[in-house]
Amino acid sequence: MKKKGLRSVIEAIQDLLKGKTTTMPKSHSGEGIFFTSKASDLFILDSFGHQLSIQTLLGDVKVKQISASKRGTRVIFEISVDSKLHLNDVFKKFTNLTDSSDFGFDKTEIRVKLYTTSGVHISRSQARRILTGLEKFKIILLDFDKVPVVGQAFADEIYRVFQNAHPDILIQEENMSEGVKFMVERAKNEARK
């Protein structure tokens, strides 16, 4: 965590979920945990008193505190013997397949709800936390599921400031409430001026 300038275990988990996260870029691509978690039915990481649980079939990702009974990290990987999931499909989902693409790992999905503890996304600093490291991707999908509203500064940081600094990155959204959609469209319109 210190090497990457992260302030908490939660920030480390958030970075893992983005993909392309490694402290040793010459030795590791930062894709291992990301793709392994997507290729399972259930993937659990227990470390430093926190648990990351990914239930791929349900599309559910949870982070919670647990009792830190032992040192180190525990990994649970479950997949049904008759799983219909193919590793090739997992890689394709996070690969830009357009003609101009190099077919690398250049697409990520961010579950916005996992980036706050209070349930509200208002501040510019919260948006910056989400955006940290995303300049490495060409396509960013922001999933706003269970996010009721975002603030003006939050939306402005993503859709005007970040987007203007990185015009070649495509930012997509899904599962927006009416409140979120209003602020996102407002920020996009301001960015066009």
Per-segment meaning from a language model:
Residues M1-K2, L85-K93:
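Short, charged, solvent-exposed linker or helix-capping segments at domain edges/interfaces
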Residues M1-S67:
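Flexible ATP-lid and adjacent glycine-rich G1/G2 motifs of the Bergerat
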Residues G49, S80-K84:
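Two-component histidine kinase transmitter core
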Residues I66-S69, V81:
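Catalytic phosphate/metal-binding cores of nucleic-acid and nucleotide-processing enzymes, i.e., regions
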Residues V90-V112:
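Short, cationic low-complexity segments
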Residues L114-R192:
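Amphipathic alpha-helical interaction surfaces in cytosolic regulatory modules
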